[in-house]
């Protein structure tokens, strides 16, 4: 049975997601459908990629991921259908594909959406193309080869000999703050040295915890979460709200001076001794 995931920024307050599921089951009756989320930001691609990737990687190889984010940023004359690392991805041609994967896949076809004007008309063409692919196992049945895609890539931490600087990419519902520094990057750069995590100018953390319970209630902590990313939090509190931290916004960053407090608060720095 084929597994198809749905991810979007649409929400679930109206009929759209239900209609798309109906299209899938009417065309591919054996499909198993799984929702990843329908509450991604339409503007913060890096945050959306973090959420999507850390769910999608747990699905079996062969899964088809239909990702509908910022769908109408450009006129949708086509959507992309790509293969990467055993998984298949359907996305608008708006840069989100490369933001998710971090690379441009070698295998990409475009699904022709000309003549489709509404969201449901476009998803009907998507589902038909996915069905052709699943029946044949050949991506050429879904569309024609295509390489001239929109490309946007995730920001990476900035590195110096004795420091790292990461951007806040996600704040969860408990206002725990996730930074785009992965454990393997941290360990490689730290080389076992003592460190100091610095944020909002005067706040520091000098120990990595294994879980929230390792510090007293109301104390701040840092750890590498289940996705392997650096997370700073306050046990029983709200880190982002208490310390004025906010998600990194590249557009806002470009409008601000480097010494602007808000710009600083979107960064987290690690210094090594």
Where do the PLM segments sit?
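A conserved acidic, glycine/proline-rich C-terminal tail/linker
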Residues: 180-259
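Active-site histidine-anchored catalytic micro-motif
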Residues: 3, 27, 44-47, 60-62, ...
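Extended low-complexity, polyampholyte segments enriched in Ser/Thr/Pro and acidic residues
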Residues: 261-263
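Structural motif
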Residues: 2-5, 31-34, 63-66, 79-81, ...
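Surface-exposed loop/turn positions
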Residues: 63, 219, 249, 266-268
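Anionic-ligand-binding alpha/beta catalytic cores of soluble enzymes and soluble regulatory domains
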Residues: 117-191
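N-terminal glycine-/serine-/threonine-rich phosphate-binding loop
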Residues: 1-76
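Fold-independent oxyanion-binding glycine-rich loops
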Residues: 8-10, 36, 68-71, 84-85, ...
